[in-house]
Amino acid sequence: GGQKSTVATMTEIYHFLRLLYVKLGTQYCPTCNVPVIKQSKDQIFASIMKTYKGKEITFLAPLVKNRKGFYKDLAVWARNKGYKHLIVDGEKVSTLRFPSLSRFTEHNIDLPTGTVKVTPENEGEIKQLVAVTLDFGKGILDIEQKGKKRTFSSTSNCPNCQKSFPELDPRLFSYNSKHG
């Protein structure tokens, strides 16, 4: 349109609607149909102690979720923090010999912060791993046990079924994205 045009097309407004849905929308659990709520570190810790009692689990901090890029700097950051491995697209990779990632391919990168057996003797270590992993994962941590992953979130958790959800992303509301 011209300089004085005030007509907006749906395509122009759509970007703002996606942001509006993410920032002001209320996320609901698809199973229970109730709004999801915030969960404290202590609640996440208690849930882990109950769910994985007697089992060996690995704490994973999701650093990159379905994003394009090289991420060499992430390997350097992890190495400087004392971590020797990252999980890149499901494969364990050394931070010393981090591969060249395709810039135009979406990647998932997780930081394994620790592996521990869930017992009362290890409560202190588990509490510390919960805090560190939530910090690195920006409020989200994954638990891996025998190849199965479960997400715990301090920002969106169902009060009924205790299922956690990742934070909303504008890409979820886009027909141009494979996530939406």
Predicted region positions:
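Conserved phosphate-binding elements of NTP-dependent enzyme cores
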Residues: 1-180
